[in-house]
Amino acid sequence: MSKLKIAVSDSCPDCFTTQRECIYINESRNIDVAAIVLSLNDVTCGKLDEIDATGYGIPVFIATENQERVPAEYLPRISGVFENCESRREFYGRQLETAASHYETQLRPPFFRALVDYVNQGNSAFDCPGHQGGEFFRRHPAGNQFVEYFGEALFRADLCNADVAMGDLLIHEGAPCIAQQHAAKVFNADKTYFVLNGTSSSNKVVLNALLTPGDLVLFDRNNHKSNHHGALLQAGATPVYLETARNPYGFIGGIDAHCFEESYLRELIAEVAPQRAKEARPFRLAVIQLGTYDGTIYNARQVVDKIGHLCDYILFDSAWVGYEQFIPMMADCSPLLLDLNENDPGILVTQSVHKQQAGFSQTSQIHKKDSHIKGQQRYVPHKRMNNAFMMHASTSPFYPLFAALNINAKMHEGVSGRNMWMDCVVNGINARKLILDNCQHIRPFVPELVDGKPWQSYETAQIAVDLRFFQFVPGEHWHSFEGYAENQYFVDPCKLLLTTPGIDARNGEYEAFGVPATILANFLRENGVVPEKCDLNSILFLLTPAEDMAKLQQLVALLVRFEKLLESDAPLAEVLPSIYKQHEERYAGYTLRQLCQEMHDLYARHNVKQLQKEMFRKEHFPRVSMNPQEANYAYLRGEVELVRLPDAEGRIAAEGALPYPPGVLCVVPGEIWGGAVLRYFSALEEGINLLPGFAPELQGVYIEEHDGRKQVWCYVIKPRDAQSTLLKGEKL
């Protein structure tokens, strides 16, 4: 790792010596420098203000000549003053190096700094991992290429916990403990746990630390499957489901406003555990998505005020957010910024750092904010939480993953975190404006009008600080969500959501022609742009501080190009050459509009948008026949049979089934196949056969080919009499 540089104004006198590389200040973005030397003229022209605004804390020196004097108001903001004096050049150089070295050291947060120092010691390893700094890989040409591709430093940093010098990641000692304490401070938590196998594991840690069989868990039906696994299958808790919204475009919405009313919640409890309906605080835990995959953001203050007194704890699954407290207009939705008292619930927040923060894949973190209930019976102490943590953590952690979490916290510390996210918000707004100005059919998912004026007519700076430009106002046609209250939800400004033609925004019905978003997504991938996901007539692009306008303009250019191909009805072989080549016999002679029409007609024929909506409405929830944990145990014991989808109607699901993404279960183990869920999967099955190349990923069901047709199969619980036979010796 090379030393950071010194940035120097081109108008500075030559008044210091240094062994570091020097670059002109206008050639640097301030991320590769350890100190900056300005002229007095630079300071008076605002350069010092620009440097301070970054929040990086880079030491700044002012070089003077001709007996210039630095105005007193600047002195507290700088590290020193250099005069143009030949005899002091080396002395000033030592001052500069001291400041630069100190900055370089504090720039590296505790765990990363310890890791770098340890690797630089060059210890001879006779412990795990067996590749021992990459040397084993270098014994073979393939392994050597592997090391050369990723770089030696990654392999040297892959350490074993056999050396206590690096502390302990499981019992949180030494540098790992300091790193997590630092993250807790940055994110306003009482305690933070770094998790190295994704938020699926973070959720299970929390759920296994809190829930036991018989506990009531208030359960957002939008919850990721990991919450079902942890709360229902592993812990055996009893769910009380909250219905959620879907709109005609396929976007995942929030929980209905009426679901947060106490009287309604007690009615739901009476349906599953009548003896608990009148308890003062009946729920051990509520599990709520702070932000849905499709960018519907909750107001945490509202959630706590409405249901907090009914819950011991609330888990805000923040896999798809985590940056909200660094964006001023989103701060009210952050559960970690809440002022809480002894009557409030304990707060737990899980964040997928790898999704939209700065982390390697699988990096996640758990934030615990519950000191306000410490001493109460419901309080979960660290030792109990860590017991669950160790159940799900590997004893062979990958140290670079942990270091990435440490760096993520450092990057978000202070002004720099807020600056990065404001840049992201601004770029997202400008990208939406470009699409509105240049596209005719593909539209950003934002209000058409704000106070009677077009959304895009407002200044970007105003939109970036005013939530009105992203709020779901009840009854407005542009979003088509039902059941929302005023100021309940808003669109995440850092999720670029677009809609494609095919839905009449005024009534939510299918139009005669449409463009399913999967066709657009495949076109973009063919041309080197990878969206996060698509569904029905919606497509999602994640925005992070990594974006710049050049990258976003490339996206807009491809959207415009797609629209031109659509208008000219270009041959499918030109638009989607890879899919066409793989399925040339099926799509021979097809045009783009022909494919769009055929897929759109399939959706309309099955009314897929309505099926999606119904699956998450209480009226259409699958009927519960068994506790999810009991159904899972039956599956593990083999008390199941694999049946075709049509034969599953009326049978008890042994596995949870879902399309991925988004990873939200449509049917839960123990529920009965039928209704909207069965019709939805039947529509997917028809699409898989009718339109090869566009098959979704399905989990919990199995696609098998019989007589030239692909069929969906699923496991269901055997009838009781069949189970009895099995227990007497029948072999599966």
Curated annotation (Swiss-Prot):
GO terms for cellular component: cytosol. Pfam families: OKR_DC_1, OKR_DC_1_C, OKR_DC_1_N. Its EC number is 4.1.1.17. GO terms for molecular function: ornithine decarboxylase activity; protein homodimerization activity; pyridoxal phosphate binding. The modification N6-(pyridoxal phosphate)lysine is found at K355. Keywords: Decarboxylase, Lyase, Pyridoxal phosphate, Spermidine biosynthesis. Optimum pH is 7.0. Its cofactor is pyridoxal 5'-phosphate. Gene3D superfamilies: 3.40.50.220, Aspartate Aminotransferase, domain 1 (3.90.1150.10), Orn/Lys/Arg decarboxylase, C-terminal domain (3.90.100.10), Type I PLP-dependent aspartate aminotransferase-like (Major domain) (3.40.640.10). Induction: Induced at low environmental pH (at protein level). Part of the speFL-speF-potE operon. Expression induced by ornithine (at protein level). The keyword Lyase applies. It catalyses: L-ornithine + H(+) = putrescine + CO2. PANTHER family: CONSTITUTIVE ORNITHINE DECARBOXYLASE, INDUCIBLE ORNITHINE DECARBOXYLASE. The first enzyme leading to putrescine and thus polyamine synthesis. This is Inducible ornithine decarboxylase. The gene is speF.
